[in-house]
C-alpha cells in the first residue's frame, strides 16, 4: 500500500476540490496515460487496484508509472459517537486529483492491448478519465 513513511502532522485539513492541475498534465515517461477529467480523492487502495489491473492485463513486456501519491490523511470518527471531543483518527490516505492530471503512464508495444489495460484501470478509479497518448496531448 502507498502511505507516507513519516509525516510532520498526523491530521490535516481536507484539500479543496477546485481548480485544474498545474503540473503533471502531460505523458512524460510512457507512451500512453490516464488523464483525470474531474476532481476526486483517490485512496491508496484504489491506486493499488488500478495498478494490479494494468499489470494483469499486460503480463510482461511493458512498464507502468504511477504519477500520484496518497499524501493526505482523511479522518473519521467512530460510529454512534456524539459530536465534539476532537477530530477523528486518520482512516485513509488520499491523493487530491484535479482535472488534467495524468494518473498512470504505460509503455507497451501494442496499442490495442495498452488501451484495454488502461480502460480496466479507469474502471477501478472513482473519477472520469480518458486515455491519452504522447502525441495527442493538449
Curated annotation (Swiss-Prot):
Residues 1-24 are annotated as: Disordered. Keywords: Ribonucleoprotein, Ribosomal protein, RNA-binding, rRNA-binding, tRNA-binding. One of its GO terms (molecular function) is tRNA binding. One of its GO terms (biological process) is translation. InterPro entries: Ribosomal_uL16, Ribosomal_uL16_bact-type, Ribosomal_uL16_CS, Ribosomal_uL16_dom, Ribosomal_uL16_sf. GO terms for cellular component: cytosolic large ribosomal subunit. CDD domains: Ribosomal_L16_L10e (cd01433). Residues 1-19 have a biased composition (Basic residues). HAMAP family: Ribosomal_uL16. NCBIfam families: rplP_bact. This is Large ribosomal subunit protein uL16. It comes from Mycobacteroides abscessus (strain ATCC 19977 / DSM 44196 / CCUG 20993 / CIP 104536 / JCM 13569 / NCTC 13031 / TMC 1543 / L948) (Mycobacterium abscessus).
Amino acid at each position: 500500500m502507498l502511505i507516507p513513511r513519516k509525516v510532520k502532522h498526523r491530521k490535516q485539513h481536507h484539500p479543496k476540490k477546485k481548480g485544474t492541475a498545474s503540473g503533471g498534465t502531460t505523458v512524460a515517461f510512457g507512451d500512453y496515460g490516464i488523464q483525470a477529467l474531474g476532481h476526486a480523492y483517490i485512496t491508496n487502495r484504489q491506486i493499488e487496484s488500478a495498478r494490479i489491473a494494468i499489470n494483469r492485463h499486460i503480463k510482461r513486456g511493458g512498464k507502468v508509472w504511477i504519477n500520484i501519491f496518497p499524501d493526505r490523511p482523511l479522518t473519521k470518527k467512530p460510529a454512534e459517537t456524539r459530536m465534539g471531543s476532537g477530530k477523528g483518527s486518520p482512516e485513509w490516505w488520499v491523493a487530491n486529483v484535479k482535472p488534467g492530471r495524468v494518473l498512470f503512464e504505460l509503455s507497451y508495444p501494442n496499442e490495442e492491448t495498452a488501451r484495454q489495460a488502461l480502460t480496466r484501470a479507469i474502471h477501478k478509479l472513482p473519477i472520469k478519465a480518458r486515455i491519452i497518448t504522447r502525441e495527442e496531448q493538449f
